[in-house]
C-alpha cells in the first residue's frame, strides 16, 4: 500500500452559504465517509483547516505573510492522509467524498514519498 495526501479545496465562503439543516446533513455524510475509511483501514489522518490565523513563511530570511496568501477565492479546507493500492484507488477514494454533493470542491490527490523507516 502507498500513502496519499488528499487536499480539499473550496471557495472561502461556501460553508456560510449552507442552511443549518444542510450543514448538519453534510456533517453526518462526512462522518459516515470518514467512518468507512477507518473501517476499511485506509485512513491515517484527516483534519479541516482553520480559515483564519494562517501564516506563510517564505524565503530563507523567514519573512511572514498573513492569510490570504493569494488573490484566489479558493482555499485549502482540509486534508486526508490515506493508504491505497495505487493512484487510481486513491482517486476513487477521493471521488467518493460526499463533500462534492454539498459544495463546489476540488480534491488534489498527491502520492507521498516514503522516507526513512516508512
Regions found by a protein language model. Give the residues of each.
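Conserved, structured core segments of small domains
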Residues: 1-118
